[in-house]
Amino acid sequence: KNARLAEDLASGSEYNEIIKAALSTPLQRPRIAPRERKSGIREGTPLVLASDWHVEEEVKPERVAYRNRYNLDIAVQRMQRFFEAVRWAVRQQRDTFKIRDLILWLGGDFLTNFLHEDDVENNQLPPLEVLLFLQAELVKGLLFLLEDEEIEQYIIPMNDGNHSRTTKKMRHATRTQHSLEVFLYAQLKLRFINE
């Protein structure tokens, strides 16, 4: 499947080159091997989902009867709180489990994109600037998680959401070729390739 996708990307722009580079490494299924068999230590692996943040989609209080508010500053605060909560939860579970692996699933729809005409007016950043914003914030969060020296292995499955598409409608055969989040994930992979 990845080989076919790589062939499909063979003719294309710099964007496709980055995607091809990210897909060039063979797909290896991550393995979490039990390490404690005789000592009686119980092992645990946290599974954390990050998705549907829609960071650039502003919610103005006056448009929602003053019941909510959301903007880029709040998005940054929530992202920081998310990563802090992950570290806190891992620390709490260490009273019961030996935790050496962590699965952080990046589930997509981190951005809203310009799927609808009013998104052009309501979103605080255009799509490419949102990618730069998200990349910077996700890198900060991942570096924060990497400070936990007891975690030996981070497994980060990634999938794109429907909002990151660059086409009017979803395309099943070429979905990843038209996904801004696949580009974002490729950039993250390149950034953390040696971590």
List where the protein language model places each region.
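Core catalytic region of metal-dependent phosphoesterases/phosphodiesterases
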Residues: 34-53, 61-186
